Curated annotation (Swiss-Prot):
Gene responsible for this protein: rplN
SUPFAM superfamilies the UniProt entry points to: Ribosomal protein L14 (SSF50193)
Native species: Corynebacterium jeikeium (strain K411)
Quaternary structure (record): Part of the 50S ribosomal subunit. Forms a cluster with proteins L3 and L19. In the 70S ribosome, L14 and L19 interact and together make contacts with the 16S rRNA in bridges B5 and B8.
Keyword field contains Transport: no
Keywords: Ribonucleoprotein, Ribosomal protein, RNA-binding, rRNA-binding
Protein's UniProt name: Large ribosomal subunit protein uL14
Length: 123
């Protein structure tokens, strides 16, 4: 589970490399977030010449999490790293034009279709 102060790898080409979670969105007492949840974060590390720079406040959706997620058929999915994709503030479209690495199938259920279509692999 992703919580406040968690550091996530960025899985898109916006120029950000690492973000730090400020807060998971969805309720005033929400403590943690999982795959498909939206978080508010700050960019901690960024590549020069990117569309975002270090210190920017962004919204991101979690696409990979180390903590296993249970699926309706009883199986579990877990990844080797915690990763997110930066999205636009007003809708669920990604700010970047490419997605790196696999993403979870749960994103399709949560209406992040553009991220699913850009991803090289959906697990």
């Amino acid at each position: 589970m992703i919580q406040q102060e968690s550091r996530l790898r960025v899985a898109d080409n916006t120029g950000a490399r690492e973000i730090l979670v400020i807060r998971p969105l969805g309720g005033s007492v929400r403590r943690s977030a999982g795959i498909g949840d939206v978080v508010v974060a700050t960019v901690k590390e960024a590549a020069p010449g990117g569309t975002v720079k270090a210190g920017d406040i962004v919204k991101a959706v979690i696409v990979r999490a180390k903590k296993e997620t249970r699926r309706p058929d009883g199986s579990y999915i877990a990844f080797d790293e915690n990763a997110a994709v930066i999205i636009k503030a007003n809708d669920n479209d990604p700010r970047g034009t490419r997605i790196f690495g696999p993403v979870a199938r749960e994103l399709r259920d949560k209406k992040f279709m553009k991220i699913v279509s850009l991803a090289p692999e959906v697990l």
